[in-house]
């Protein structure tokens, strides 16, 4: 199957995602909707951000336009009751959950002596705890999906567990938060292996040109040497449509997934056409 396959392979299946109002998460949701999936988004963005486009409502409109039914949930991934209610509403509305995408993430790359504990706690609560919370609450529905032969997956947007001290030394708080997400993948893949639930992580090999990156210092230059969110969306689609029992415990890079499935033209994902150097992403 190529990354551009247009079949509705996810027809009748349901995906629940943390975040997704914009950027990589929205691209993944739109790609899944185009393949027929029902989508639940859990996101805080009820109103527009002053610097970043997109709300959970505009995202829902894009998902519907792509062909998917959507349940937008305005809520905080840090709140247990909100996430539990979103899982319950999803099962009630769509009849189950087949795919969990842990996409919500906070970032602050300040060094340890400059990172306020409030920011540290925010990253741990959204990135690591939020991933654990949504995944664990969805397990009963995912087990039912497996028993029904519906090929359930958990996919977390987090990096390979690279123990080179370079990254921890540069941004310890953020590294702990992202590696916490990856450790959740490692543990749940083993815990749920016998259930036939695929649990994997996905990370971009290069930086991705999102509005959030553009608004950071030097962002315009960074975006120019980045790829578009669609490379992650196409890779995520290929992971969650693979056989769950045979695809678990992996830390995938987006371009590796695509080339393994026969993709040869990765230049179409460049923000800036040409053959100039691309900026590698963190943790690689």
What are these model-predicted stretches?
Residues 32, 96-98, 182-185, 192-204, ...:
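Conserved Rossmann-fold SDR core element
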Residues 135-136, 186:
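A short, exposed helix-loop element centered on a Lys and neighboring polar residues
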Residues 201-202, 219-284:
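C-terminal helical subdomain
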Residues 2-94, 108:
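Short-chain dehydrogenase/reductase
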Residues 143-194, 203-207:
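Catalytic loop of short-chain dehydrogenase/reductase
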Residues 111-112, 116-121:
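Substrate-binding pocket helix/loop in short-chain dehydrogenase/reductase
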Residues 14, 98-99, 121, 148-157, ...:
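Conserved catalytic-site loops of classical short-chain dehydrogenases/reductases
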């Amino acid at each position: 199957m190529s990354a551009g396959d247009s079949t509705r392979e996810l027809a009748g299946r349901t995906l629940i995602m943390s975040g997704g109002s914009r950027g990589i998460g929205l691209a993944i949701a739109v790609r899944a909707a185009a393949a027929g999936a029902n989508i639940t988004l859990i996101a805080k963005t009820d109103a527009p951000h002053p610097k970043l486009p997109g709300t959970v409502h505009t995202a829902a409109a894009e998902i519907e336009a792509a062909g998917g039914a959507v349940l937008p949930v305005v809520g905080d991934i840090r709140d247990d009751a909100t996430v539990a209610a979103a899982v319950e509403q999803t099962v009630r509305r769509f009849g189950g959950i087949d795919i969990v995408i842990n996409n919500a993430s906070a970032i602050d790359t300040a060094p340890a002596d400059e990172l306020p504990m409030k920011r540290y706690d925010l990253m741990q609560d959204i990135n690591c705890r939020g991933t654990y919370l949504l995944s664990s609450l969805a397990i009963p529905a995912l087990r039912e999906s497996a028993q029904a032969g519906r090929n359930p997956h958990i996919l977390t947007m987090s990096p390979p567990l690279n123990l080179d001290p370079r990254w921890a030394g540069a941004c310890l708080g953020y590294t702990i938060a992202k590696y916490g997400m990856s450790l959740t993948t490692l543990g749940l893949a083993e815990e749920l292996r016998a259930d036939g639930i695929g649990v994997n992580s996905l990370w971009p090999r290069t930086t991705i040109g999102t509005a959030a990156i553009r608004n950071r210092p030097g962002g315009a230059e960074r975006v120019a040497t980045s790829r578009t969110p669609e490379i992650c969306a196409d890779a995520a689609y290929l992971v969650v449509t693979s056989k769950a029992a045979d695809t678990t415990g992996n830390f995938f890079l987006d371009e590796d997934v695509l080339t393994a499935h026969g993709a040869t033209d990765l230049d179409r994902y460049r923000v800036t056409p040409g053959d100039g150097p691309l900026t590698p992403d963190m943790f690689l």
